[in-house]
Amino acid sequence: MDTTFGNGECEMFTSPHQKFCATQTSPSNMKEPDEPGVALKNGQGVHFDYHMHPEARKDSESTVVAGESHSEMPISSNGHNGTIAVPEGYGANSNGTSNKKKKKKSKKRHIDATINDPDAEYPTSRVIKQAPNGDVIVESLEDEHHDHHSNLSATIWDNSTIEEQEDLKRFWESLEEPEKVKLVKIDKKSILDLFRTFSSNQQGGQPTHHSPASSSTSLAGTPHHGCTCSSCGRRSSIIEAELEMIYDNHFDDIIDFIHEVRDIKDLNALPGLLFGGFHMLEEEHRMKKTRARRRSTDLQPQTRISPITSSTDGPPEPTTTSNVSTPSHSESVSSPSPWTNAVAGLLEKFLQENPGASWNKCSQLFQEIQEAGNQVNPGNGSSEGSDRENDDKKTAFLKDFGEMISGGFNDMTSGKQEQFHENFANGIHKIANDFLNNDGKSFVEMVEALSGSRSERADLLKSLQEIEDHSNQQEQPGTVREQIEELHDEEPVIPEDIQNQPKEVVGQYVDQRINQLSELRDRLEEEYDYDTYDDPEYDNQEYDEELSDTESEISEEEKMQEIRRLFLIQVIKLFQERLKNAYKEKLSQDRTRRLIEELEAEENAKKEKELKKLKQKEKAKEKKRLQQVAKDEERRRKEEEERAREEELRLKQEELRAEQKRRKEEARQKKEEEKRKRIEELRLKKEAEKKKQEEKERKERELKEKKERESKEKEEREMMEKKEQLKKEQQPKVEQTQEKPQAPPSQTSQSNPSVSDPISSRQDNSVSSLDPTHDLQNAISSGLEQLSLGQQPMSHISSQPSQSISQLPIQPPSQPFLDMDQIRSPVTAPAMPTQAQMPQSARGSLWGQPVNNFSPFSEGVWGSRNNSIWGNSSMSGGSIGSGTMGSGTIGSGTIGGSASIWGSQTPTLANTTMGMGLQSGINGIQGLSLEKENGSASIAGTPGNSLPGNSLPPISRNSLSGNSIPGSIPSSIPGNLSGSLPGNLSGSIPGSLPGNLAANSLPGMSPSMSVPLPQPFPANVDNEMIRTAAYQAFMLLQNSNQLEYGLAAAVKLYQTTILVLSMEVSFSQFLGSCRDDIESSYRFDYVYDDYGAVSHIKASLRSSLWN
């Protein structure tokens, strides 16, 4: 047997090649086979099992999913669903496109089948199709046409088991209020989808009117499998058009009605409403509307619409009839009520056949009673009072019977089965009493008026095909056509979900949809009776008149009542589906949750087992680890002991080395301390001697100054007395001269030289007191003059204290300090006087010689502080300058031997003579050490030398003033010096120098020579200046990255300080000035070397004066 499942394809089964197992089963007791295979159901009582070979069964399991060796999918056969398990190689998962592949796969699987019931008839002509959702559908092809009017089964809810209904009720009660409201929420789209789904399922269950080939060629992807004939298509179009019109015009009224019906009970009563209770509610609502309408209208006869309910569906179905009276109707008024007889017969039959009936049977009885009552329409001859009375009694009967059924349902759902039977029996007696108390008169007119409805409906059903054929040629009303088209064209929304439900539910759902379509068809037949238009003589005008008369008979209220009832049915079904779907979803979630819990439990059990194994392994590892730890501890203990012994030995050796080092260090420090003490003692001794010498010099200087001051005062007094005497003597002469013409000023000044001399002498003295160079020149000139005159040097001069130029202020207050470049610039002296201008004795000796490059401000003159001419050092062995005093010799004796006074590389006065005259000596003085600027030589010689007896004492400032140099010639000059002078020199120098020479020192000297000289470094220079220069030098070294760990080398800092200060300072004086002073703004930290000498210095600013 060749089969193909997938892609909507189907094949005919004409020759079976397998054996089948066919057993007569019912849908309720049908069970799945114990072994995996294929289960197909065809019809109501035949069950086919396709079993696999035992060898092939090893590769599969009893329960499989799609994509594995087998796949299960729901199937539908003639309106019933089942389950098919398709082996691998068949169905949707098969890729077989040729018979060879299929045969190979069938050989591998070894599929065998056996027939348990050979007498069962096997359908040789059938079609197996695949639905769009993958379902397998088996259809028989024996009959060419399906029956349009198949037997209608009970609804989903009426055939539900007690357990399912109880579960649904419990599920509804467990829902929260928002969830309940969401389930009962009504919208237009949901109801419209229900109608379309109903139409699709109804057409899918009906057969077609053409050959079987057309059915097999229907598309598998279409949403339904309905008939495609022109009659069915037009009918569906009409129905859909009518529904669309109803939605557009009456949707709001319908929704209000549905809400009114739904709100009669609270949400907790919804299960009872869904399981049949809504019949009573709808009927009660309809009766109330009828009574209200009758009270508001007159006594004229009106057309009423009585509900017609099918025998298999719960909701009532509307049916309209004509109000034309017939003779049979008038005769039936006096006859017994057929509804009474029918109800009595139904009750009696029910009690006999169902002594222990279930609730479902009671619901069917209630529907039959309703159907019996709805099939009878009261006649037009009855009065308004009788109709109202009949309606009230009928309403009371239906209400009592509905309450009894609802109470029975509540008892059954709560588990009170015995109480249900008791209540049902009591309810039957109550209904019977109420029914018999009307004496057959309550419902006579109502039932007899409706007696003709059943026969009329039967006739309409028989002529349905003729009406459909006739409706193809006639113009149908737009509303009905649109309603049919809407149900036919729209795609179903629910069928795929319903097909996944159990087979009993799906079958009931399909039957319900068939019933609804039948009701719509009955409405169409009843509203439009085309039999009256079959007469060819019936023209269009008569048709229009009769149609208008019929429409006028049906009031708008009755139409709305029918529409409301129709929509009420759909809303109830919508509620049912929603509740069922929600319940299924909850069941699925619960199962999923339980499955997850089971999986978690299994996983936890596995984890616990693994954890136990891990614990055992951990224990074993821990035991091994403890053993290893013990071994490691023992090994570490031994190593620690070994290290402790080695450490103890090492400490002893270090102590010995430290002790030896300490002893050496103590010895070294002791030596250094002794050395420092000796140095300090020598320094203190020198300082004491220096202080004594300075004190002695100071006293001598003060004494000399006092004598000079007294002599000056005496001279000034004498000068003043002389002036006063001269004034007194000259006053008569002045008076006489005033009478005479005044003489020129030049003559006056020449005539009184004595008056101007004292003033000029005082001016010269004042100038000379400010110009050390002037004093030096006067001293030299006076000394030479005395030497030339052969005067003996004064011995007492050496004992007089000399005033050092170092005691002069660093900078005179009246003028700024001279620039060093200006000081070092050579000075060009004016031309010396000629020999004609000089005295006869001085010609050719001193005058007339050129003066070359004399500058007393050269660096050679002002050397270092230790070699300074202004210090207290001796002048032993020094010469006057780097140049010679003259070409001739002064005598056989020398001044100071061969040592140089101004430099170390200049000729001395030892071998020079004064024969060349005074001019040559002046030239030598003017050329003092200009070429040598190294500052290594000085007039004072090396430091520390004492003054010998024959050395020149320091030249005093006061001794250099005036026109003469008293006592300026030192006593150390040998006595034979004066005798060695040539005679012409002693005779050529006058006793007193000319006035211009006395006032301006030596002739040829520039007037600019009288400016104060820069001193190298006075003894009492400010220490703060040295500190400032030292700090600037430290910052320069720091900016040039010449520091060593933030410290500057002492020697390098000293050299940089000398450059910044532009003065010569000794290293000891530099260190002494930089020592910490609490009043200074700078702080200097010293670092000493191993011998106690300062090696490095760190300079910083003080944060405060008291830091």
UniProtKB/Swiss-Prot annotation:
Subcellular location per the Swiss-Prot or TrEMBL entry:
Cytoplasm
Q: Does the keyword Coiled coil apply?
A: yes
Coiled-coil portions: 508-733
State whether keyword Coiled coil applies: yes
Q: Where is the composition biased (Basic residues)?
A: 99-110
Q: Where is the composition biased (Low complexity)?
A: 207-226, 321-338, 791-809, 958-967
Recorded GO cellular component terms are: cytoplasm
Q: Where is this region: Disordered?
A: 21-42, 57-120, 201-226, 286-338, 525-556, 605-775, 791-820, 935-967
Q: Where is the composition biased (Basic and acidic residues)?
A: 605-621, 630-738
Please state the protein's primary subcellular location: cytoplasm
| Highest taxon in the source lineage | Eukaryota
| Record key words, sorted | Coiled coil, Cytoplasm, Stress response
Q: Which residues form the signal peptide?
A: none
List all Polar residues biased stretches. Answer: 298-313, 745-775, 935-949
UniProt lists the family membership as follows: Belongs to the NST1 family.
Described purpose of this protein according to its UniProt entry? May act as a negative regulator of salt tolerance.
Q: What is the protein name for this chain?
A: Stress response protein NST1
Organism classification, top ranks? Eukaryota, Fungi, Dikarya, Ascomycota, Saccharomycotina
